[in-house]
From Swiss-Prot:
Family, similarity comment: Belongs to the UvrC family.
Domain GIY-YIG: 20-98
Protein purpose: The UvrABC repair system catalyzes the recognition and processing of DNA lesions. UvrC both incises the 5' and 3' sides of the lesion. The N-terminal half is responsible for the 3' incision and the C-terminal half is responsible for the 5' incision.
Molecular functions per Gene Ontology: DNA binding; excinuclease ABC activity
Protein name in UniProt: UvrABC system protein C
Annotated ranges, domain UVR: 209-244
UniProt KW keywords: Cytoplasm, DNA damage, DNA excision, DNA repair, Excision nuclease, SOS response
Cellular component terms (Gene Ontology): cytoplasm; excinuclease repair complex
Superkingdom, taxonomy of origin: Bacteria
Organism: Hydrogenovibrio crunogenus (strain DSM 25203 / XCL-2)
Length: 613
């Protein structure tokens, strides 16, 4: 980074010696903050364009007026520049760039094809298991809907391996015809079961027409052999598949994998909607609401930013339909094709089929934007009401709330949840494992959590919240006041939310450093609703974090005490049996069935849990 810009930046000299090769440029303001990151096929031409005499866009003029220095990184190709640009935008989140929310991972459907009787399941995260992954889907709901629909047609099991390995009779899923019961011998043959698995895979690959054709042949064959009950079963499957097909706008064989990206704008707000079609099947949709950095809205520029940020580490379809013209369409196609190692095209909707898809995506985007604007108005009203109730100088747009959770004083965890403009910012949540206090001392736990949180905030110069919410009464509030005095941050607005009579919702009392008598709001007050929402979210996160810590202690500590049992063996035991209780109850012969467990180790584990070690 430039050295605090102690010397005057000479733009003319900089541009004179700037290369004409592709690369990325970073613009800094006078304080040394990166305010914009851009890419260019020709760095000299692109960067020079910012410093011409007049600009049509106010955004560009405002940006240029704040530039104190520029750095460039030269790349071999424009595609490399695009990847680097995206990485830097995600890392630095510059004020004038278009920023889309970074989903940590998208969900997939997983088929455990390596098993004798494969299962079908929801999957999110690293792809370490052996099998087939289908996706990504835009959200968890789309996965669950697909799994539910498939289960009705092809009764492939959706249970975990530990449950499957320990069934002695079929579960409820078998009774309601959602599973063919491969866990119990004699209910379904391996060949019959794998036929359903292959049909499921073919459907997920977008080959539903092939599946229908195959089922049609089997129906005819069963009918010819007078197996009318079996023929009726195939007929019902065909009908169910056709019903699914009828719900999709693309329903012809050989359809390309296609994503449809549409943009809607209103009141200087934007919604980008993506609809994912795979093999003719609609896998779902997702709406995104980018931060556009106070700039004027350029639909093509926003969609380009979406494409670069969305597909940087996701599977790329063969075709992307867009609602607006993209200036950098050619370079985006080149980059996407290089990533996919196959031709990728970006198009406007021309054919009737594509126009139908785009119309649906635009409707989705417009609907999502209206809902977002309505929700924002409601949230802004609640934040303003809270400002009035607590007599704050400005709206509490950045709020942080703390809560404590433990079981009889053990595995104590403090939570800190963050709300921005009345909405949870889950990526900013923090938890604190509390150590070195008297078990059950909530005051000491709160003191430690607040000290750790704001010591770091102060040390690193991070933004301070507009309001800190404490779950508790005057005692907890006074502990917080002591911490902030010690940290010399005693001007921060604080409020504690104490449970009212009978601990009933709506009867809470609010305490602030300047109002020790308490503020008693009506149960339907929207400011109280917001505080209760924040407090309940802190409570939920504290309990979830505490349970995780407690479970980890209970599950792993005893296994760690067994001589000769290392981390890999512990993992194999828990994966195979599904939990510590099942490991405890297992016989020596059952323990030996776990891969890598010898007779000697199995006996050692058994003896440990049965009091002989």
């Amino acid at each position: 980074m430039p050295n605090q810009f102690e010397t005057q930046f000479d733009i003319d000299a900089f541009l004179k010696h700037l290369t004409e090769r592709p690369g990325v440029y970073l613009m800094y303001d006078a304080s040394g903050q990166i305010i914009y990151v851009g890419k260019a096929k020709n760095l000299k031409r692109r960067v020079s364009s910012y410093f011409k005499k007049r600009h049509e866009e106010i955004k560009t003029e405002t940006l240029v007026s704040q530039v104190a220095s520029i750095e460039v990184t030269v790349t071999d190709t424009e595609s490399e520049a695009l990847i680097l640009e995206n990485t830097l935008i995600k890392r630095h989140k510059p004020r004038y760039n278009i920023l889309f929310r970074d989903d940590k991972s998208y969900p997939y459907i997983f088929v455990s094809t390596g098993k004798k009787f494969p299962s079908l399941s929801y999957h999110r995260g690293a792809k370490r298991k052996v099998g087939r992954y289908f996706g990504p889907f835009p959200n968890a709901s789309a996965v669950h809907q697909t799994l539910h629909a498939l289960q009705k047609i092809f009764p492939v099991r959706q249970c975990t391996e530990s449950v499957f390995n320990h069934r002695s009779r079929p579960c409820l899923q078998y009774q309601i015809k959602r599973c063919s019961g491969p866990c119990v011998e004699g209910l379904v043959t391996e060949a019959e079961y794998n036929e359903d698995v292959q049909h499921t895979i073919a459907f997920l690959e977008g080959k539903s027409f092939d599946v229908i054709e195959s089922l049609g042949h089997k129906m005819q064959q069963a009918s010819d052999e007078f197996e009318f009950e079996k023929a009726a079963l195939y007929r019902d499957k065909i009908s169910a598949l056709r019903a699914i097909q009828s719900q999709h706008l693309i329903n012809q064989p050989g359809s390309k994998d296609t994503d449809v990206v549409a943009l809607a704008e209103e009141a200087n707000q934007v919604c980008v909607s993506i609809m994912m079609y795979r093999g003719g099947n609609l896998w779902g949709s997702q709406n995104y609401f980018p931060k556009i950095g106070g700039q004027s809205i350029n639909p093509g520029e926003i969609i380009s930013a979406f494409i670069t940020q969305h597909y940087i580490d996701l599977p790329i379809p063969q075709m992307i339909l867009v609602s607006d013209v993209l200036e950098d369409k050619s370079s985006l196609e080149t980059w996407l094709s290089e990533q996919k190692k196959a031709k990728v095209s970006i198009r406007k909707a021309v054919s009737q089929t594509h126009k139908g898809l785009m119309k649906l995506a635009l409707t989705n985007a417009q609907s999502g934007l209206k809902q977002q604007l309505t929700q924002k108005a409601s949230q802004a009203e609640r934040v303003k009401s809270l400002q009035d109730v607590l007599a704050l100088a400005s709206p509490p747009n950045h709020m942080e709330c703390f809560d404590i959770s433990h079981t009889q004083g053990n595995q104590t965890v403090a939570s800190c949840v963050v709300f921005n403009e009345g909405v949870p910012n889950t990526s900013a949540y923090r938890k604190f494992n509390i150590e070195g206090i008297q078990p059950g001392d909530d005051y000491a736990a709160m003191h430690q959590a607040i000290t750790r949180r704001y010591s770091r905030v102060k040390k690193e110069g991070l933004p301070l919240p507009d309001l800190i919410v404490i779950d508790g009464g005057k005692g907890q509030l006074n502990k917080a006041i002591d911490v902030f005095k010690t940290l010399e941050l005693d001007n921060l607005p604080l409020v504690s939310v104490a449970k009212g009579e009978g601990r009933k919702a709506g009867l809470e009392i609010l305490y602030t450093p300047f109002n020790e008598e308490g503020i008693d709001l009506e149960a339907d007050d929207i400011a109280l609703h917001l505080l209760n929402y924040i407090r309940d979210e802190a409570h939920r996160f504290a309990i979830t974090s505490h349970r995780s810590r407690r479970q980890k202690a209970q599950t792993h500590s005893r296994l760690e005490d067994i001589p000769g049992v290392g981390a890999k063996t512990r993992h194999k035991l828990l994966t195979h049996f599904g939990g510590l209780t099942e490991v405890k109850n297992a016989a020596v012969s059952e323990l030996q069935k776990v891969p890598g467990i010898s007779a000697r180790i199995a006996q050692t584990i058994y003896d440990f849990f049965h009091g002989e070690i």
